[in-house]
Amino acid sequence: MVADVLLTHFNQLFCLNDPGHPLTGQEMKKATIVEDGYIAIKDSLIVALGSGEPDAELVGPQTIMRSYKGKIATPGIIDCHTHLVYGGSREHEFAKKLAGVSYLDILAQGGGILSTVRATRSASFDNLYQKSKRLLDYMLLHGVTTVEAKSGYGLDWETEKRQLDVVAALEKDHPIDLVSTFMAAHAIPEEYKGNPKAYLDVIIKDMLPVVKEENLAEFCDIFCEKNVFTADESRYLLSKAKEMGFKLRIHADEIASIGGVDVAAELSAVSAEHLMMITDDGIAKLIGAGVIGNLLPATTFSLMEDTYAPARKMIDAGMAITLSTDSNPGSCPTANMQFVMQLGCFMLRLTPIEVLNAVTINAAYSVNRQERVGSLTVGKEADIAIFDAPNIDYPFYFFATNLIHQVYKKGQLTVDRGRIL
């Protein structure tokens, strides 16, 4: 087979044999590091991988050849938890955070999520589209090729749908692949204050059926937290969403452990998000149900909290984990997955191999894209992040700098030295 594109002489390729399930426990520590590696691409797919000189049959008169001495290649990075589409920003809350005002106290004062809800409700489709596109561009420049994007800053049907429509439009227009999550249950809207059950009934009866019918989202999510939605309320919504055919995610055990992990395990959610306050029993329940733990260390960093999710304990117990930005305007205003990956080492005490497995193959399972992306594997799409680094440890050791040299998306050179092509 003659390749369309042949990428050669990488210092290292980060490869693994996809076992057919998210990596857990000791599997997280394993990878195949190919020295002097090459990748052959044809029709957007990886068709060959190896070390040294490529087979002669891969090279034809039209084959594009590129050498990458001094560089490494990983699968395209996957950010599997973002709140991508929103109006406004919340830098005016930063001084309060520095003064020690808590996230929940800011929310109780009418700030936080509810502040962004007001800004998003007043934002036009074009405004939301352009703002979200800028964030996606930034993510792409940092090596991200697949992104999960939630609604949840409308809390009414008109605005929630506008958010989902923005995600759908960007999925068509932007190089990054988007996976949509419906999260109208992100907070209790002011018009339903004191009556969350009535709001959940509106979501179940009036919103979810339309989201499903119009294929606007693949996943359904809810914020199970003190002063937001209880475990029983979360179970009520997610069980109905599951009956309609949605895959499930749940924000759980972020600020307090109130039973969200139990709901995730009972309903076999694909992932439980945050988990800073998870208990040993909660870890065991998620392992038993095969739920992926999606950890968001940049949120803990941004909130200036001391308690990070117990990632080391999770992996050692046999749990599958991922890492994501939680990109949002309040608790985590960043879109930089390289920073998150570095926090995975510095604050969660993971190794570079564990982090790379978390943000590639496990993240692919978290967004139900494991058949297409998540590993440098023959037959998968050629989503490739190329780092200006001599080995896979270097991007973690040399922190707070964008080390992306190039990005390939579906076999096409999409980013080249800081420029989107």
From Swiss-Prot:
Record EC number: 3.5.2.7
Main localization, broad class: cytoplasm
Pfam families: Amidohydro_1 (PF01979)
UniProt subcellular location: Cytoplasm
Keywords: Cytoplasm, Histidine metabolism, Hydrolase, Iron, Metal-binding, Zinc
Residues that coordinate or bind 4-imidazolone-5-propanoate: 90, 153, 186, 254, 331
Binding of Fe(3+), residues: 81, 83, 251, 326
Protein's pathway: Amino-acid degradation; L-histidine degradation into L-glutamate; N-formimidoyl-L-glutamate from L-histidine: step 3/3
Any single GO BP term: L-histidine catabolic process to glutamate and formate
GO molecular function terms listed in the Swiss-Prot or TrEMBL record: imidazolonepropionase activity; iron ion binding; zinc ion binding
Cofactor note: Binds 1 zinc or iron ion per subunit.
Swiss-Prot/TrEMBL cofactor(s): Zn(2+); Fe(3+)
UniProt-annotated binding residues for Zn(2+): 81, 83, 251, 326
GO CC annotation: cytoplasm
Residues that, per the record, bind N-formimidoyl-L-glutamate: 153, 328, 330
Catalytic activity as recorded in UniProt: 4-imidazolone-5-propanoate + H2O = N-formimidoyl-L-glutamate
Family: Belongs to the metallo-dependent hydrolases superfamily. HutI family.
HAMAP family cross-referenced by the UniProt entry: HutI
NCBIfam families listed in its UniProt record: hutI (TIGR01224)
PANTHER family linked: IMIDAZOLONEPROPIONASE, IMIDAZOLONEPROPIONASE-RELATED
Function text: Catalyzes the hydrolytic cleavage of the carbon-nitrogen bond in imidazolone-5-propanoate to yield N-formimidoyl-L-glutamate. It is the third step in the universal histidine degradation pathway.
Name of the protein in question: Imidazolonepropionase
